[in-house]
Amino acid sequence: MSSEQPAWTFGLFTPDQNKQAPLEMNENAINSLYEAIPLPQDGSSNGQRQEDRQANSFELKRETLVATDPPRPTINLDPRVSIYSGRRPLLSRTNIQGRVYNFLERPTGWKCFVYHFTVFLIVLICLIFSVLSTIQQYNNLATETLFWMEIVLVVFFGAEYVVRLWSAGCRSKYVGVWGRLRFARKPISVIDLIVVVASVIVLCVGSNGQVFATSAIRGIRFLQILRMLHVDRQGGTWRLLGSVVFIHRQELITTLYIGFLGLIFSSYFVYLAEKDAIDSSGEYQFGSYADALWWGVVTVTTIGYGDKVPQTWIGKTIASCFSVFAISFFALPAGILGSGFALKVQQKQRQKHFNRQIPAAASLIQTAWRCYAAENPDSATWKIYIRKQSRNHHLMSPSPKPKKSAMVKKKKIRTERDEGSTDKMLNIPHITYDHVADDRKNDGYSVESYENTVRKPFGFLDPSTGPFIRTSSFTDDLDMEGDTLLTPITHISELKEHHRAAIKVIRRMQYFVAKKKFQQARKPYDVRDVIEQYSQGHLNLMVRIKELQRRLDQSLGKPSLFLSVSDKVKDKGINTIGSRLNRVEDKVTQMDHKLNLITDMLHHLLTNQQGSQSIRTPHRSNSLNSENHPSRNTLPTYEQLNVPRMTQDNIS
């Protein structure tokens, strides 16, 4: 292998030397573990190889499988994970059941919306024709049209019920006969079955030619009303209503209880006041307590039919007072339910916005952990880049394969017929592993394992096994004689330092991308959410400010604690900084006062001493006595006091 060949790639193989695949790293050094397959440099060798393969087409049909994918870009991924593969996904019975079940029971997308909306329109049109059949002017036309529409709807809903029952087998709890019975016991399934069976009975028994009997038309109208329940098969509206009522059950019970008490009392007092009153026609308006209750229900619900009206002024006064009180309580449940629905919708929007953050947060956590785990060279995080060797799938088998079954041969011929035209458009034939269905008996592969293999993400360091050929012919062995295969990594020790460095760089980039996506998912989605976020932030800020103020008051102290006259209040703030500073100021003031007093005394004594020295006494005895017994009031002068201190300062 020349030094210009790429030593290794991230699971990609580039047949064109001028175009390099993304995430490809080139090295000049020869790597024994990763060697690229040398490709022919001119077109003549390609044509010669193509002619040789066409000459041995019969033998290749028996022993090899040549991939004939449609034209695709120069990047050739592994055939199991190639996004350019022309193979259609395998359709099985379980797969079809799941798709039909999701289409009918879990509608998502515009196709499901169009189907279910069309069914709703058909049911609504049938109901409109049923209403028109009650009008004398449109009776004949509506009845005849309704007859044929009922036949079509019965056949359609019957077939749909059977399909729903069959498709429910894709779920584990509806598998088998007992599972189907469990599915048929669902309330909406029971309603569908009743509508279908009753419609068939009405069409068979209650019709004469193309005309319905009167009783049959009544039954058809009732069944058409039941068909409207078919629109909401999931019961989302009923669940939403039930959740709102359950959340606000306490408020609803309170208002209904008080309103019911007001209804009973108002009806009873009006009955006592109006039981003997006679109206203009000579009849009793409130002849019984039941008439009074009917009047109360009509009044407090703000319907007001006017069939029962109080006649006396006492009854009118009682009715006015109780109506204002009772009507207000009977109107409260509507407001409670309305606010509950609004809060429920807002909660669903927030939950939907929060659900968008879960994948972004999980991706961020995963990428952060992988960046952390990549720092350890012996970590198990490197195992995802290692490909396990297949035990039963050998390349270049020396022994010929046994004969395939007739079904496998037909499938191979059909695949070659569908994709044979695309093989001529390729300059280099892409040869892959045998199809999974061809090696099912020998290699033990299944459709489920194939689908799981396709879904499994491959590491970008897995070298592409490239276009391989499985053959035992001597001619093809000569063709592949000079080719060198890329050896897959089978152990962590085979990962080089540049491999690990590239993995760390890519993981760090994935971390930054996941972080950006998570920050975008965390952004508020509504103005109300922004306002709530700001109000929550303001509340947190005020809480922190109050906590800081409390700590400052605890450390510094409030002025009212240490400036108060009461000793009990002073004791509360004795350990605060303010109290200590206040005590220091008091001590400084006392010291200043004492120093002023001492200064005045010294000045007074100095004045007295100077006056006593000016008067000289002639008696020596007095002078001797004064020398031997100095006066207690005699103090040193200011200069005498300063001289030792100045001397001490000079010494220091």
From Swiss-Prot:
This is Potassium voltage-gated channel subfamily KQT member 1. It is a multi-pass membrane protein. The gene is kcnq1. The keyword Zinc does not apply. It is found in: Cell membrane; Cytoplasmic vesicle membrane; Membrane raft; Endoplasmic reticulum. Its main location: membrane. It catalyses: K(+)(in) = K(+)(out). Residues 401-414 have a biased composition (Basic residues). Pfam families: Ion_trans, KCNQ_channel.
